[in-house]
């Protein structure tokens, strides 16, 4: 269940469509927790994990209408090599491939969001529209 703020201001998260396995699949880049680095931050997903099983999982989901690629590992897997910044800036081109490129949600991105106001002004509204369309489709 989302945080209290999201529940108070957003859609009714209790609706069954948010938990309908035929509509939404959250597929991580690794099915393990890779641990912490020396400073206590989460380590990125090991490339071996996605190399081992990701293609099979994605093939088992043939009717995907929208892929939200969140973070560098997911962006590289879905869109190929490149900087997260460049892939997110090129979100319209990525949408042509059926992929919505997003930075990893983190407090570390606060400064990036302030330097890139287009993200919340342009990308986020389009993301909301696309997600709503997928969830409301019958």
Where are these regions (language model features)?
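A polyanion-binding, active-site-adjacent surface
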Residues: 1-136
